[in-house]
Amino acid sequence: MTTTLEEQLSDKLQMMDETTDKVQGSSKQKDDSSIAASSDAKTASPSSSDSSTKVAAPESEFYNKAQKYWSEVPATVNGMLGGLGYISAIDIQGSNVFLREIRVPGNRLALDCGAGIGRVTRNLLIPRFSCVDLVEQDPAFADKAREYCTSEDGSRGKVGQIYNVGLQKFTPTQQYDLVWTQWVLGHLTDRDLVSFFRRIKQGLAPGAFLCLKENVSSSKKTVEDRNDSSVTRPLDSYEHFLKEAGFRIVRKVKQQNFPKGLFPVYMIACKPVSKE
């Protein structure tokens, strides 16, 4: 993964009490391999709300600890979602509605960042695109993803490259119609997050979208999870970092119908300021 996670949501969802949003020991979601800055990842650069990520440990330790955490997680949907595998269908439904609303102009090639075992690739991206590339840092997840995403006849031949690298080191070499990151950006330092956004900008086809789906803190503070070495940022931090990297936000929607007690989850679609 890099991810983040996808994170992912990459996107690893864990119950937390709404009243403990300020408590730094609280858990958080991650998805499809929110693996330390691999396929679901995290970043630097102070935001206007003074919510910049404060990584107590050295940067290498921050990433290594997250990588170790995800290496011990089962390569299953339930593992990717922190024991909350039952929310996968609701999550995919919300993402499908979001993509219909923004009307991605092309259907040739998509990129799943922090892909984990490919939950988002299989259920959201493969039905929409001719080919999907994945970025996933964890080797076991990457191996499982190719199997999981090609187990149905309609998906054969639709999985392209699987980049086994962290998002903090990933540079796209293709032009994508859509780049999707989910539950992984919390595994990047602020500095690496902005740098990742800037590199992704160079890998977007004309009119293409970068989409984020991430947990956000309910307060203006960044919440640190030392267990998996990640952070949950306020929504305005993502807005600030996207602007700093040269993106404009086209649409922003809160995911509905998730169980109570989880962090709010937002989807953000954006385009480079210099591209239409």
Swiss-Prot record:
Gene transcribed to yield this protein: Ntmt
Positions that bind S-adenosyl-L-methionine: 114, 119, 136-138, 167-168, 182
Protein name as it appears in the record: Alpha N-terminal protein methyltransferase 1
Pfam families: Methyltransf_PK
Sorted UniProt keywords: Methyltransferase, S-adenosyl-L-methionine, Transferase
Region (Disordered) residue spans: 1-57
Molecular function GO terms recorded: histone methyltransferase activity; N-terminal protein N-methyltransferase activity
One of the record's GO cellular component terms: cytoplasm
Record function comment: Alpha-N-methyltransferase that methylates the N-terminus of target proteins containing the N-terminal motif [Ala/Pro/Ser]-Pro-Lys when the initiator Met is cleaved. Specifically catalyzes mono-, di- or tri-methylation of exposed alpha-amino group of Ala or Ser residue in the [Ala/Ser]-Pro-Lys motif and mono- or di-methylation of Pro in the Pro-Pro-Lys motif.
GO terms, biological process: methylation
Keyword set includes Isomerase: no
EC number of the protein: 2.1.1.244
Keyword Cytoplasm part of the UniProt annotation: no
